[in-house]
Amino acid sequence: MATFSQKPAEVVKKWVLIDAEDLVVGRLASLVANRLRGKHKATFTPHVDDGDNVIIINADKVVLTGKKYTDKKYYWHTGHPGGIKERTARQILEGRFPERVLEKAIERMIPRGPLGRRQMKNLRVYAGPNHQHEAQQPEVLDVAALNRKNKGNA
């Protein structure tokens, strides 16, 4: 029997809705990254975008374990000499775009390259409880019920 290799035309994508309220960032990001890549499917093929479309709501209510809320730093560089900047997870979560903490965690778990960028386009993250994808009839995935450690103690 030959190894199965899926073609892009054969891909069937589902829509999945996840409520991130009180969920641990890293555990949620790991699960979502696998969903976006399609590794949860028996038809997984490394060079094909086989993952599901994932919608995450309440991304502003995620939980960071330990002292990461105050101590974890996100760095970027402006491109100018001495242009290294940093911001803590607390500053981002209390700032204008709190969903970026979760987006960055997921983005850094996806392989870099053209396929990874395409798979990241299948992710929609919203800070509040509302989203505009009701027409896709997303299937609700209860991440907290999968493992007791997925839910934060907050």
Curated annotation (Swiss-Prot):
Gene Ontology cellular component terms for the protein in this record: cytosolic large ribosomal subunit
Any one Gene Ontology BP term: translation
Gene3D superfamilies named in the record: Ribosomal protein L13
Pfam families recorded: Ribosomal_L13
Keywords, ordered alphabetically: Ribonucleoprotein, Ribosomal protein
Top-rank taxon, per record: Bacteria
One of the record's GO molecular function terms: mRNA binding
Function: This protein is one of the early assembly proteins of the 50S ribosomal subunit, although it is not seen to bind rRNA by itself. It is important during the early stages of 50S assembly.
Protein family (similarity comment): Belongs to the universal ribosomal protein uL13 family.
Subunit structure: Part of the 50S ribosomal subunit.
NCBIfam families (alphabetical): rplM_bact
Protein name: Large ribosomal subunit protein uL13
Organism per entry: Brucella canis (strain ATCC 23365 / NCTC 10854 / RM-666)
Upper taxonomic lineage: Bacteria, Pseudomonadati, Pseudomonadota, Alphaproteobacteria, Hyphomicrobiales
Gene behind the chain: rplM
